């Protein structure tokens, strides 16, 4: 019998979603701080059969935590103790910013979904960088053979004009790349005005080129570079991004971010409307994110690492995406509904299926 769904219903479902997230994250970090993490590591460690190599890095598991949960790098070690093969931190911006006004995070429990308009709330690249460096060193000590991987997701500072976006991203790349295992350029959040315009290939080309050069120079090594795209792109735009990624020799693409669509939801229309603007994540995104993944795989073959995210809830969802061409898979929204042992459960089921 699983306890967490009952706990969620009694303790979290009635609470403001952002407050529930904050309390849950504090609980995860507290478990690490009190030494319970040592026990958790033994209980949740992915089976060796799940080790996966992407852009020259060995991941303990193909399944990781998407950006958005740990925005500022406060809980990287604690989250890896739950079984995630990688943790993508962020989105982080060049300057600290408070994000959008609250309330800005809403659950659609009937759909196992979330609507957010957080707006890249974070304390800025300069504040996050030391946490990343410390976490990376700690993970190396704790896991001397194959350690969990740290991804870093960067976005545009809201007050920076689009014309100055390249320089803003370069600040983040320069500051964060030395402590990142891989770097993600986020141009697909719907919650920063104008950000998605950067997905146009003519604008995206100089941005990705500049970020890649800045990251490698700052780190003194090649830092794998990926771009994260929206599910709302047309098929033609997806093909254009794929061609650009191949042309620039990017290391990969993450598909997909949240959607601005609201079709096919089980939640009452009035409730959805009350949530207002923002990106929808969770189960309703499953079909479209898989479609985008398949199209990217068709366009890029084996030349890029594809990371699938969007509507991932079960081990079967992870396997479906691996079968469709993803090398790595991420989740986030289902973590809120499934609880702290979600990643470990997925890893166990994946390992079991590989033995059979």
From Swiss-Prot:
Transmembrane segments: none
Cofactor binding mode and count: Binds 1 FMN per subunit.
Cited SUPFAM superfamilies: FMN-linked oxidoreductases (SSF51395)
InterPro entries: Aldolase_TIM (IPR013785), DHO_dehydrogenase (IPR050074), Dihydroorotate_DH_2 (IPR005719), Dihydroorotate_DH_cat (IPR005720), Dihydroorotate_DH_CS (IPR001295)
Membrane topology field: Peripheral membrane protein
One GO cellular component, as annotated: cytoplasm
Chain positions recorded as FMN binding sites: 67-71, 91, 153, 186, 228, 256, 282, 311, 332-333
One Gene Ontology MF term: dihydroorotate dehydrogenase (quinone) activity
EC number: 1.3.5.2
Pathway: Pyrimidine metabolism; UMP biosynthesis via de novo pathway; orotate from (S)-dihydroorotate (quinone route): step 1/1
Subcellular locations according to the entry: Cell membrane
Pfam name, any one: DHO_dh
Positions annotated as active site in the UniProt record: 189
Main location: membrane
Binding positions for substrate per the UniProt entry: 71, 116-120, 186, 191, 257-258
UniProt keyword annotations, A-Z: Cell membrane, Flavoprotein, FMN, Membrane, Oxidoreductase, Pyrimidine biosynthesis
GO biological process, one term: 'de novo' UMP biosynthetic process
Cited function: Catalyzes the conversion of dihydroorotate to orotate with quinone as electron acceptor.
Subunit structure: Monomer.
Recorded family membership: Belongs to the dihydroorotate dehydrogenase family. Type 2 subfamily.
Record's protein name: Dihydroorotate dehydrogenase (quinone)
Native source organism of the sequence: Pseudarthrobacter chlorophenolicus (strain ATCC 700700 / DSM 12829 / CIP 107037 / JCM 12360 / KCTC 9906 / NCIMB 13794 / A6)
Organism lineage: Bacteria, Bacillati, Actinomycetota, Actinomycetes, Micrococcales
């Amino acid at each position: 019998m699983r306890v967490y769904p009952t706990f969620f219903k009694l303790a979290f479902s009635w609470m403001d979603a952002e407050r529930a997230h904050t309390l849950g994250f504090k609980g995860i970090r507290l478990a690490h701080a009190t030494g319970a993490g040592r026990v958790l590591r033994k209980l949740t460690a992915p089976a060796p059969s799940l080790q996966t190599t992407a852009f020259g890095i060995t991941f303990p598991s193909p399944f990781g935590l998407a950006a958005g949960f740990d925005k500022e790098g406060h809980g990287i070690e604690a989250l890896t103790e739950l079984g995630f093969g990688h943790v993508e931190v962020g989105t982080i911006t060049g300057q600290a910013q408070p994000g959008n006004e609250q309330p800005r995070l809403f659950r659609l429990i009937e759909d196992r979904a979330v609507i957010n308009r957080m707006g890249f709330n974070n304390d800025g690249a300069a504040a996050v960088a030391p946490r990343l460096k410390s976490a990376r060193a700690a993970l190396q000590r704790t896991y001397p053979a194959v350690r969990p991987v740290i991804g870093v997701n960067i976005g545009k500072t809201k007050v920076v004009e689009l014309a100055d976006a390249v320089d803003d991203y370069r600040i983040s790349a320069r500051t964060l790349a030395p402590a990142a295992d891989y770097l993600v350029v986020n141009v697909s959040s719907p919650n920063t005005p104008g950000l998605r315009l950067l997905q146009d290939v003519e604008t995206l080309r100089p941005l990705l080129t500049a970020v890649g050069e800045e990251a490698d120079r700052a780190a003194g090594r090649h830092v794998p570079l990926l771009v994260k795209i929206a599910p709302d792109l047309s098929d033609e735009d997806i093909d254009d991004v794929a061609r650009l990624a191949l042309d620039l020799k990017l290391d990969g693409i993450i598909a997909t971010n949240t959607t601005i669509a609201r079709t096919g939801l089980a939640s009452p229309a009035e409730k959805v409307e009350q949530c207002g603007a923002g990106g929808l994540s969770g189960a309703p995104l499953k079909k479209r994110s898989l479609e985008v993944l398949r199209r990217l795989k068709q366009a890029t073959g084996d030349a890029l690492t594809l990371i699938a995210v969007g509507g991932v809830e079960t081990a079967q969802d992870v396997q479906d995406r691996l079968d469709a061409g993803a090398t790595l898979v991420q989740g986030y929204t289902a973590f809120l509904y499934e609880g702290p042992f979600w990643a470990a459960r997925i890893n166990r089921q994946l390992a079991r299926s590989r033995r059979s």
